[in-house]
Amino acid sequence: MIDVNKFESMQIGLASPDKIRSWSYGEVKKPETINYRTLKPERDGLFDERIFGPTKDWECACGKYKRIRYKGIVCDRCGVEVTRSKVRRERMGHIELAAPVTHIWYFKGIPSRMGLVLDMSPRSLEEIIYFASYVVIDPGDTPMEKKQLLTEREYREKREEYGQTFNAKMGAEAIKELLQDVELDKEVAELKEDLKSAQGQKRTRAIRRLDILDAFKESGNDPAWMVMDTIPVIPPDLRPMVQLEGGRFATSDLNDLYRRVINRNNRLKRLLDLNAPSIIVQNEKRMLQEAVDALIDNGRRGRPVTGPGNRPLKSLSHMLKGKQGRFRQNLLGKRVDYSGRSVIDVGPWLKFYQCGVPREMALELFKPFVMRELVKRDMASNIKNARRKIDRQDDDVWDVLEDVIKERPVLLNRAPTLHRLGIQAFEPVLVDGKSIRLHPLVCEAYNADFDGDQMAIHVPLSDEAMAEARMLMLAAHHILAPKDGKPIVTPSQDVVLGNYYLTMEQKGREGEGMIFKDTNEVLMALQNGYVHLHSRIGIATNSFTDKPFTDDQKQKIMVTSVGKAIFNEIMPKDFPYLNEPTQDNIVNGVPDKYFIDKGEDINDYLEDAPLIDPFKKGFLSDIIAQVFKVYKVQRTSDLLDDMKTLGYTQSTNSGLTVGIADITNLKEKPEIVEAAHKKVATVSKQFRRGLITDEERHDRVIQTWNDAKDDIQQKLVDSFDPNNPISMMSDSGARGNISNFTQLAGMRGLMAAPNGGMMEVPVISNFREGLSVMEMFMSTHGARKGMTDTALKTADSGYLTRRLVDVAQDVIVREEDCGTDRGLVVSAIREGNEMIEPLYDRLVGRFTMKDVLDPKSGEVLVKRNTLMDEDTAQMIVDAGVESVTIRSVFTCNTKHGVCQKCYGRNMATGEQVEVGEAVGTVAAQSIGEPGTQLTMRNFHTGGVAGGEDITQGLPRVQEIFEARNPKGEAVITEVTGEITAIDENPAEHTREITVKGETDTRTYSVPYASSVAVAEGDHINRGERLTGGSIDPKQLIKVRDVMATENYLLSEVQKVYRMQGVDIGDKHVEVMVRQMLRKIRVMDPGDTNILPGTLLDIADFKEKNTQAIISGGIPATGRPVLLGITKASLETNSFLSAASFQETTRVLTDASIRGKNDPLIGLKENVIIGKIIPAGTGMATYRHEEPKSVGTVSDSVYSISDIEKQMKAKDGQQGDTDKK
């Protein structure tokens, strides 16, 4: 076998008949498969051992030669070579056809490739191939045309008239002769001449023909090879025949299809030998043609060939296509050994980097390692005994297992894996039971809960794999989400509740006003019952030696609560003391108002001091983000573990729980409901008198009930007892929100109707009172709709992610700096008065392109090519800078990827991105993963005049990325100038808007229904909207330039996501949009060898033009094209990647005609052929590096303790530098 990691590229082409024969090990002459008595393969049949190799290892068919010592001998009795039986998966055979047949892919595809080469219509081709018409091949000296079609009758008449002077035939033979007559060079030259004058349809057709003919010419494929004389037979183990219990056989459909071809071929041979009448021979040839068509692509033409039970047989094409095809089922989605799956359960005692693995599962997963260890320790004499010992589960096996799994990470994966945090590495810990135990804090990244979710576990085997799992994938390192760089491991539920309860304050609790010398004394007082967790007390500030208090504060006493003193124990030693839940406290330390002088009376202070809010979920998240920023990964994961333990302990001790008595009744509810009923009655009366329309009545009724519900909700909130457990749970962010509470204690309100509107009758009861039957029934509509929407949305969102990944999978950070001189000017994105994305968010983690100047003083704030962190970005915003020119993926010059400088910071680590990072895939996952949170519906601006439907949510995202014409398209102006008039045109039901530019004046007619976005006298730039709605980006790219289009697409995507409260980094959207705009359509080839109308990558286009200019020619001109992501995926340079995405047969047909060469640049094509992917440590730059030895080699190179020490040291240095 060839080593896959050695070759550089892979090429596909048409196979000539000689090529097919050279692959073959022999001709299959009979349709037989295996003998029904002996079950041995028949000679010359589809499973013949002489052709395909022996069925048993090192054994010929007749049994004369057995054992490996006869390797390579061909048996003189049965003619079978003695070798391994696995050659039956590699050796091919062939069938010699008695008459040529056409390959259906090249005849039937759209456009028909054969039709283009011969310049004939597919319909006339079909008539010739399936023996309905004759075609004139050589008219001789008759007045007929070449390629003229003749019916049977016309043919006979012409034969009588002209005798044998002309040549006309039917079937694939005729096509083959015509194809052999095609002179490629001459045709190409003629077409190039024609193109100079051709217009319209004629030009399009000429360009298409030229494209195909040029492809044949360049690739060295012969057009006649589209007609086959010989058919390859794939190896028998790839189309197996197996015996089922009960003696019946199950066989692959391909065997049936091959049998039909062989039967018809043999019958045709016999008819030809007998000199049968031509009509019988023709019929047999047609049947042979149809049999071969069915073998290659069943069902492409006519009715598919069916097997038992009218099921269409699966042909060769079907073996490749779709989710169950070879590409997606076996090449991109392999199942792997050393894996298991089980239900997950919570493991609150685990450390952040650990997971619990059931004993039996671990024993099975690590079996080989345990066996080796048993033999090594002389606990078993050989491997066989070791295996027996394991199967018996002897006691000493468990001790060995404990030692084996030390230092060996395992991977846990939860489907659906929506982003890279769906697979993380953990250190296994053996647990009893049969469920995998998961650390509660990683649930958010996996989107896991413990209601029966399952997870898969995998064991990295090689040293490299273990090192990568440990260094790159350990759960404790994944604290930030790749999509927005915010912490993803935030405490939730019990942990939040525990810490909330811990940091609460209450007036007048036991021990209020006591003053302690340090935290230890506080803990002692708590344990002895002198103080309560919620008691407000004083602590001598100077007891906190490492905390950053001011000198003045250190002389005083700090007023805090017992719980907060405990909470601060888990924080890093020199982190500010946290006394109030504000960002100011996190960054700048405790405000002065919480300190009293040493002699001052603390009770007087506490009398007037308001209670400080406890720490809620959002605040805990802010703490984690700050700790991560200052102290880096290791300290943060320690803090998270401590916070988890503290939270669980405190929520257990607090005894917080929910009882039905905690749901209080609202006294004012009956009055509010009564008032609403009266108001609705009034509205109905107005409608009956004809004062208002039905629509207005409906809107007002809905409004009335919504107001009533809001009123009840507000009163509930006002009457909340802060110590009510339900209100504590909702307020802390642990579980539930205000609307849950309203439904429990207030009223449920209006329900959704099946048609998407609202029902006018509200559900007045709440769940505490109980619903009536009618109310219950009304609620079911909404509930059912919610379920179906979610299911549909999940599928849609998953498909969007798949397309995004496919289009961007080859975007990898390839180099440090591309040296571009262009940048992207960014400013805050606004929609009307609403801020969509502030400037700060757009600057963090990006490089500057130009110096940033202070708008007031003009001094340089930030130099060019500087990576902006949070502080720098904040400084720029505070200085009042409106827009900044940054390095952007849009303007990056790197071929096949991006450079470090244009990409900036890696969101998931907070450091500059490394060469080799697969940023395309990360971008696709970051956009696709929140897809399920977007709404499915298109919003309607209800009843507002001139408001058109705005598509939002998931449909809008798909519309943008697929570059479709938007719903509610806006009219844009093509000139810059002033709006001189807006006139009504009642006859056409339109308005005419006139724009006067510098050179010309344009008038645009817009429908009455659309809202006009401009007024007379406005100045307008080209590409701006005249009406409301979304701009069609394909129009924009024509009117403006690529940059404007890229910017528009970026801001549109951000609008959708940010409106739904999902933050995504700009750079992810930039990567996707750049992939949509990476092609150029060549308009005029100049002196290059490009054909007009070709789609080329920008990089290739520049390269060809550079060559043309160097050799003194005229460069080609082209215009940028915006492709939707599906189209862009199929237009990629890699045919393997495109074929495994969609439209497999079309992609392969086209690639083989062009003799395409796949350079194996992206990730997907390398996975398909099993080569190491060129990202991360698989980059060529890293692969060729020799390991350097620095100092002595440590034995425990992968030991966790060592790595933790190194990381702590490194984090310490980082922390120091950050603090300076």
Swiss-Prot record:
Disulfide cysteine pairs (residue numbers): none
GO MF entries: DNA binding; DNA-directed RNA polymerase activity; magnesium ion binding; zinc ion binding
Cofactor binding notes: Binds 1 Mg(2+) ion per subunit. Binds 2 Zn(2+) ions per subunit.
Gene: rpoC
Protein name: DNA-directed RNA polymerase subunit beta'
Binding positions (Zn(2+) 1): C60, C62, C75, C78
Entry binding sites for Zn(2+) 2: C818, C892, C899, C902
Keyword Ubl conjugation among UniProt keywords: no
Subunit structure: The RNAP catalytic core consists of 2 alpha, 1 beta, 1 beta' and 1 omega subunit. When a sigma factor is associated with the core the holoenzyme is formed, which can initiate transcription.
PANTHER family: DNA-DIRECTED RNA POLYMERASE (PTHR19376), DNA-DIRECTED RNA POLYMERASE SUBUNIT BETA (PTHR19376:SF54)
